[in-house]
Amino acid sequence: MQFPSLSCGILIKRYKRFLADILLPNGEQITLHCPNTGAMTGCATTGDTVWFSTSDNPKRKYAHTWELTQTQAGDFICVNTQRANQLVQEALEKRWIAELAEYQTVLPEQKYGSENSRIDFLLKADNQPDCFAEVKSTTLLTENDLGMFPDAKTERGQKHLRELAAIAESGQQAVILFAILHTGIQRFAVAKQIDPQYAALFEQAKNVGVKVLAYKAQIELVLGKPISMNLQFSCEI
């Protein structure tokens, strides 16, 4: 998956969950939309480098969207939770996920379950039961390179586990895929200390046959096309 063209600045603060102020290289301060409802622990430290996209939609109140954090330790984190589903959808359609490569049809955002839910992806294949796949963006880095989910209590996440467990018990396939979007994470575990109820439901779901996958994204910046130059002005972040 390729990001749109990104610009960068230095994070001043995140506030009201969905907003963040950053300082651009030219000294201008702007406000970004933050597309992440989580605690963003370790992803929003003052002084980190923020990479953002810019929309040309005139109806948007905030034209800029926070996409990546580059921490002062050098790690990259994708904080736009929508990117997790886009990344996984591409991987499913190209059959890059070995455990799910048998499914030919990928249907995003399908209604299902008894709690008025939407599954991230409904997967279909000839002569196979349907597979219901839920994606969780994972960015919380703890000690010893351990990544954890959730980073805050999540009633919505608890509901998803109940729905997936019911699917598995009905004889269909159910999968929860943790998309690791922090380059510093090397291992994964459920954050029982943050949301004990989620951890309990996770164990129940596993025990009734919900499959658990964790895939780490490769996040990198690469050299792009040449641009015009103004040699009379330069700045550094």
From Swiss-Prot:
Encoding gene per record: sfsA
Source domain of life: Bacteria
Protein name: Sugar fermentation stimulation protein homolog
Taxonomic source organism: Actinobacillus pleuropneumoniae serotype 5b (strain L20)
NCBIfam families given in the database record: sfsA
Family as reported in the entry's similarity comment: Belongs to the SfsA family.
One Gene Ontology MF term: DNA binding
